[in-house]
């Protein structure tokens, strides 16, 4: 069975891993980095992903960041003169990760396990699966990020029974999961979180502070200047990271804008104490889900054996201190918070292929599921933290006499009234025979698969007529849209490949011209004019093809030049070897002669 890669598709950074033997290994990107910025930019028709895209974010307005925060919504982003869905942008990131994973493995990759925040709803999970499909990946499993982290942490501890709390604060989302580990079973007891809390919010606090201070000093509002704001974002992110290691950092942004008297510069010192003060409310928000998860699991703090920190934002000292204060435990630092989720996803891939044995993952649904009933009430069928996959049925009836159809309004959330919860979809069961209210028996069945994706069935028990839908929210893509996007992605991949081949060819041509010119110069006056003339003619032909920008001609002329240049190089080598041999022969003869001069005749006298 082909390899199944594990992908952590993050808000700020993404990572890809693969199982090698029994060990999960992070695959470095082409720049040698173990995580890749989740940034996509467009330039001259080219799609740029990762580090290169992030570097040009300041100067390129067609750059998209933090697209994960829009997954599961109908919101689109404008770039490159087009509108893109969050699924399409995410697919570009996935395609890039897939590409360099294939380069590392030396084989085609078609399957992946992709992680999502535990608190992602059905629409967000479906959007992630669609993004994988657009990128040419069969998504074998959607796994919750804290669960994946627990897999990576606990794989070598399957003989040990313990309860762990995973505190996962990423770039845009926050999750807390409590798991019980033992005998190879990873049982999620509860999960809680906040999909609107992450490292980006900490950056924003610094940005708001810098904008306010600059306005106070110079009377200019930088928030209206797009380029200045991108520079501030980069500086804020760097300052946040610096303050994880030092207590004070200098923010210096020369020529940030211009005033009446000329250019203005932003110079400011930010202390850790000030940063802690600015972000105090964000840190406080992390405490509620911790308490919620413990309550749902029916556990006290004393029953938690280990606290695992996941996500780059858990490096913030105030966050670490808050975790210590809230749990009464020193966090376990045996895992890399940036890499552990992708590694866990790769392990789950190994479980699917059978390479990892005796491991069972029991995950849960993060939010309750149900339907709207009379009076706008939300009636739950499946409670949050129910182990998945699962199925649950309940019988309902009509609200009016002779009602010919029922509308099924499918919801996800925890609020008692339907209007306050997230609509997953609506469908209708029709042709109900005329009967007084309360007589028809309508059975509604909810199914949640192993990926946390929901399907709902309504059945008239009297007529056995049924209607089934796989939930597709208003942000969901149709099969036709996904197919079109897949074709676009494949076309872009082909165009990117051609572009890379073109760049490689041009580099080879430049290198060949440089090397041949050097060789021709070195062989001047050394007696093999025919070979030099042939190489010079081939060199001139290649330069002409280069000037005409004819790629096919350049390729042909490059091969011809390499052949002629090789002939010249062989002659040069043979001449050098002959000279070396002659020199060694002369030195040998001289050594023999000198040895004869040193011989002294002696007389032997017998005593």
Curated annotation (Swiss-Prot):
Compositional bias ranges of the Low complexity kind: 580-591
UniProt keyword terms in alphabetical order: ATP-binding, Chaperone, Nucleotide-binding, Phosphoprotein, Stress response
Upregulation: By stress conditions e.g. heat shock.
Positions where Phosphothreonine occurs in the chain: 173
Region Disordered, annotated ranges: 580-607
Acidic residues compositional bias, start-end: 598-607
Keyword ATP-binding (UniProt): yes
Single annotated GO MF: unfolded protein binding
One Pfam family per UniProt: HSP70
InterPro entries noted in UniProt: ATPase_NBD (IPR043129), Chaperone_DnaK (IPR012725), Heat_shock_70_CS (IPR018181), HSP70_C_sf (IPR029048), HSP70_peptide-bd_sf (IPR029047), Hsp_70_fam (IPR013126)
HAMAP family named in the record: DnaK (MF_00332)
Similarity-based family: Belongs to the heat shock protein 70 family.
Function field: Acts as a chaperone.
Protein's name according to its UniProt entry: Chaperone protein DnaK
Species of the source: Streptococcus pneumoniae (strain CGSP14)
Lineage: Bacteria, Bacillati, Bacillota, Bacilli, Lactobacillales
Encoding gene, per UniProt annotation: dnaK
């Amino acid at each position: 069975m082909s390899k199944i890669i594990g992908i952590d598709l993050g808000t700020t950074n993404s990572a890809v891993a693969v199982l090698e033997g029994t060990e999960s290994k992070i695959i470095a990107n082409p720049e040698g980095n173990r995580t890749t910025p989740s940034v996509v930019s467009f330039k001259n028709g080219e799609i740029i992903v990762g580090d290169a895209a992030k570097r040009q974010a300041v100067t390129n307005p067609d750059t998209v960041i933090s697209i994960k925060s829009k997954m599961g919504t109908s919101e689109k982003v404008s770039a490159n003169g087009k509108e893109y869905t969050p699924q399409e942008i995410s697919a570009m990131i996935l395609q890039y990760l897939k590409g360099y994973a294939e380069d590392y493995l030396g084989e085609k990759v078609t399957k992946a396990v992709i992680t999502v925040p535990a608190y992602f709803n059905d629409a967000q999970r479906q959007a992630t699966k669609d993004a994988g499909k657009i990128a040419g990946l069969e998504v074998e499993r959607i796994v919750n990020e804290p669960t994946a982290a627990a897999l990576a942490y606990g794989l070598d501890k399957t003989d040990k029974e313990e309860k762990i709390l995973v505190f996962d604060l990423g770039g845009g989302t926050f999750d807390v999961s409590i798991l019980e580990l033992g005998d190879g079973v990873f049982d999620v007891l509860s999960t809680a979180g906040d999909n609107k809390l992450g490292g980006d919010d900490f950056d924003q606090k610094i940005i708001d502070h810098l904008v306010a201070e600059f306005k106070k000093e110079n009377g200019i509002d930088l928030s209206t200047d797009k380029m200045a704001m991108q520079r501030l974002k980069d500086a804020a992110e760097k300052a946040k990271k610096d303050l994880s290691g030092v207590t004070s950092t200098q923010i210096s942004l020369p020529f940030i804008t211009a005033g009446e008297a000329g250019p203005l510069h932003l110079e400011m010192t930010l202390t850790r104490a000030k940063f802690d003060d600015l972000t105090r409310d964000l840190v406080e928000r992390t405490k509620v889900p911790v308490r919620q998860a413990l309550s749902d699991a029916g556990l006290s703090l004393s029953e938690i054996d280990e606290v695992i920190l996941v996500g780059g934002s858990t490096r913030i000292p105030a966050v670490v201190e808050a975790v210590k204060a809230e749990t009464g435990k020193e966090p376990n630092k045996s895992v890399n918070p940036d890499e552990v989720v992708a590694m866990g996803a790769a392990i789950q891939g190994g479980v699917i292929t059978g390479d990892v044995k005796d491991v069972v993952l029991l995950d849960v649904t993060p939010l309750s599921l149900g339907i709207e009933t009379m009076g706008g009430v939300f009636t739950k069928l499946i409670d949050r933290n129910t182990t998945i996959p699962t199925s649950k049925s309940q019988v309902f009836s009509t609200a009016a006499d002779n009602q010919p159809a029922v509308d099924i309004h499918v919801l996800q959330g925890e609020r008692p009234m339907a209007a306050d919860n997230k609509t997953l979809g609506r469908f209708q069961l029709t042709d109900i025979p005329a009967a007084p209210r309360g007589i028809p028996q309508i059975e509604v069945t909810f199914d949640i698969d192993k990926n946390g994706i929901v399907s709902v069935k309504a059945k008239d028990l009297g007529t056995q007529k049924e209607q089934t839908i796989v939930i597709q929210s208003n942000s969901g893509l149709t099969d036709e849209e996904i197919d079109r996007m897949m074709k676009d992605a494949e076309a872009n991949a082909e165009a990117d490949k051609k572009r890379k081949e073109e760049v490689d060819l041009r580099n080879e041509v430049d290198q060949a011209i440089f090397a041949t010119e050097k060789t021709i110069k070195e062989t001047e006056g050394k007696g093999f004019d025919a070979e030099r003339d042939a190489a010079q003619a081939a060199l001139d032909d290649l330069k002409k093809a280069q000037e005409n920008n004819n790629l096919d001609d350049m390729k042909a002329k490059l091969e011809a030049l390499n052949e002629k240049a090789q002939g010249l190089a062989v002659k040069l080598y043979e001449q050098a070897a002959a000279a070396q041999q002659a020199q060694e022969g002369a030195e040998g003869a001289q050594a023999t002669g000198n040895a004869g001069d040193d011989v002294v005749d002696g007389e032997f006298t017998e005593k």
